Amino acid sequence: MSYILAEALNFVRRGISHLNYWGASHSLSADNYWESNFQGFPRLLSDSSKAPSTIRTVQVLEDDVDDIAIQYNKIVRGPLDYLLAIPGKDIRSKLIDSFNIWLQLPEEKLSIVKDIINLLHTASLLIDDIQDASRLRRGKPVAHDVYGVAQTINSANYAYYLQQARLKEIGDPRAFEIFTRSLLDLHLGQGMDLYWRDMVVCPTEEEYTRMVMYKTGGLFNLALDLMRIQSRKNTDFSKLVELLGVIFQIRDDYMNLQSGLYAEKKGLMEDLTEGKFSYPIIHSIRASPESSELLDILKQRTEDEAVKIRAVKIMESTGSFQYTRETLSRLSAEARGYVKKLETSLGPNPGIHKILDLLEVEYPTNEKGRV
């Protein structure tokens, strides 16, 4: 039985003991006690006609409690498990493995960090797809189209607290502060991204980069900080992690508008339908302030392929894709240089170099400007 499920069962058992204690000293019906003390919580017995008349006679077999907790957990996790079953790029797990070449955590500790990050990332995608009104995720229908918006939001929130509960497995009180700070950063970054989109405010490149450090870098930093507090080595990787987060997000922005494979997995140029101010779009708008055409297209949240292709042509005319590739090349070179400095004291790390190789972008090869 998993740690989290065991904790849930213990909670229910403590509740039953509490009920029995109060029932022994108060003449109170089960219905009245529940309504006065546990409003909003589900009953263990859904049919009140089958409930005993007084609390002192309440008896619930432990097997029944186990079955109920298992059933609730399975239902609530539905959207989360749905997305977990669809393979992703797994870049975060690869990143954790790469840094562990230096930090040398044992497998059992590393596994806990991976699980926490994977569940948090998956939960954030559930929310992200709702906020962006997405239709596809990893080539499949988004979870909220299968399970509904309300259940998907609840499943994502449930996942956050599931992982918070796992922090005690790390065995360091600093883990909770690290976890809280990282989730705050993630939500701050996401909030600014949504604000610019919904208010139709085009940020500067500097503002966008800062947002990415919060939004994308939040989980990257969480993973590395949880690893560091368990390692005998205490090297500060924050600069490298920030660079990797920015590279990852700008590359994702580029691929959204240029990659045919991305279109199959996420939808054709979905950032345009979302109305998102991604890196190439920001550059194009600011490179041609006298023209409002691209901004006007962005406002429409269009799903029309011809209009999207027109938007791409505008970005090509302002050199925005070339500029984005040059930015990625510069950031990658900076990251590689930083890795080499770290390697002089920590030893070779081929894993990080492979990550950077994976984040290299291809050049467009067809008439639509998409590879």
Curated annotation (Swiss-Prot):
The protein's name in its UniProt record: Geranylgeranyl pyrophosphate synthase paxG
Gene transcribed to yield this protein: paxG
Essential cofactor(s): Mg(2+)
Organism: Penicillium paxilli
Binding site for dimethylallyl diphosphate: 137, 215-216, 249, 256, 266, 276
Lineage: Eukaryota, Fungi, Dikarya, Ascomycota, Pezizomycotina
Annotated residues for binding of isopentenyl diphosphate: 89, 92, 121, 138
Binding site for Mg(2+) 2: 128, 132
Single biological process term from Gene Ontology: paxilline biosynthetic process
Main location per the UniProt record: other
Site positions (Important for determining product chain length): 160
Enzyme class: transferase
Disruption phenotype: Impairs the production of paxilline.
Catalytic activity, as annotated: isopentenyl diphosphate + dimethylallyl diphosphate = (2E)-geranyl diphosphate + diphosphate; isopentenyl diphosphate + (2E)-geranyl diphosphate = (2E,6E)-farnesyl diphosphate + diphosphate; isopentenyl diphosphate + (2E,6E)-farnesyl diphosphate = (2E,6E,10E)-geranylgeranyl diphosphate + diphosphate
Residue ranges annotated as motif Peroxisomal targeting signal: 369-371
Biological role: Geranylgeranyl pyrophosphate synthase; part of the gene cluster that mediates the biosynthesis of paxilline, a mycotoxin that acts as an inhibitor of mammalian maxi-K channels. PaxG, the geranylgeranyl diphosphate (GGPP) synthase is proposed to catalyze the first step in paxilline biosynthesis. Condensation of indole-3-glycerol phosphate with GGPP by paxC then forms 3-geranylgeranylindole (3-GGI), followed by epoxidation and cyclization of this intermediate (by paxM and paxB) to form paspaline.
